[in-house]
Amino acid sequence: MEFSSQLSELTGIKPIYPDIGLHGGGWHMHGKDGNLSVHMDYSIHPKLKLQRKLNLIVYLEEDYSPEWGGSLQLWSHNYETNKPLKKEKEIFPLFNRAILFDTTQKSWHGFPEKINPPDGKLRKSFGVYYLTDVTSTAEERYKAHYERI
């Protein structure tokens, strides 16, 4: 069974398509003082015109230490201000850990504090995104929306 079919069965999302062009995906590497502001990803793929639905992130730095920072933060949404409301969860970038989450219209995430790994160490991950047909409730956001926390 193809991986996309397994994801569809696991999540109930039908149809589901891999973003084979890796728009916004691929390798993500951050060294000393690197960070990623809390943001919502694009909701509509700018070329394929499909709705972004799932993020799959795999962490690839061996021996990454918690003291260096860089845990992925998942935030709730403030519907009055359309901004992040509260940090709900932190996920440490443990080597070979995979995170799969629904890229909803309000799924704020990032690691806003600067990281502090020693020279030669990076926070490495690989991101792959999955798309579906556009729903009637999808906001048309063709690029990520960032907020400073």
Give a label for each model feature.
Residues 28, 33-37, 41-53, 61-149:
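Catalytic core of Fe(II)/2-oxoglutarate
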